[in-house]
């Protein structure tokens, strides 16, 4: 409900693949990835038109159930934390891989770009981008690769219309 009645927007929350939160990890053990983990994605639906989009700021891996959910979507905002899994280690700014932190990489055979390749999603926008990610640089080869694959890179003040 909005302040003056129904908002005309419905929100459906659903589990996305994730690792367990740090406070639930067992010391010295790989926490692994759960297909229905402790992270959520949202489908936001305009009740009047039926148009919708997905908002998934954190996702550990692309799974078949997630592929089925997103196939043919008009718009997906998706986890773009890292370009490559070992990015923070290679740059000397962290000691964990993206996977260890519960984030799928943009690139690679198991990355988001490859994972969305055959889903028929009309518009794909990377969000939640770490400051170590070279895709943030307009003239980087990584940015060119992402855009050539049909992805947009979110930016402060970006407005999106369905």
Predicted regions and their residues:
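Core dinuclear metal-dependent hydrolase active-site scaffold
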Residues: 1-69, 156-162
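Cap/insert and terminal regions of metallo-dependent hydrolase folds
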Residues: 37-39, 48-52, 60-158
